[in-house]
Amino acid sequence: MGDVAQRIRVTGVVQGVGFRPFVWHLAQELSLSGWVRNDALGVDILAQGADEQVQALIARLRSEAPPLARVEAVEAATTTPSAHCSGFAIAPSVDGAVATAIGVDVGVCPDCLGELFNPNGRRWRHAFITCTHCGPRFTVTTGLPYDRSRTTLAPFALCPDCQAEHPHAADRRFHAAPTCC
């Protein structure tokens, strides 16, 4: 049987909470192609692959969201599969009339606390430690969709080490907008 494609809309508190990296990881696990991006309504996903795998993605978006996310709705619509769709990417955000919410600031998570007090780590005693699971969201956001370019951190370039973490899928700071050093 051939591939199917679904356009999936996720609404709620789904920006600034590690939702795009979460979707990316699920897509890799399920061998799906397509993309995920933030937009003015929440998160927009194109998922293409075996029907069983696409349906598994939709179910898991509802049941396994990141801890800071609050999924209000997951809506899917069938679309035409593309022969040119390969791999799964975090696509650039799309602007529009804002109808989504941003998460609240969250205290430091246990993993970041471990780094904060590790004298051998590069984030030892770093006052602005954060990852996709903790740190500032609301107080640094200047606009939506939520991306680093729409935070108060936008004028500050990432150092080479932080820049290397940002696109690295296995890292807690994968696409974490408030990362800084």
For every predicted segment, state its role.
Residues M1-T179:
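Intrinsically disordered, low-complexity, mixed-charge
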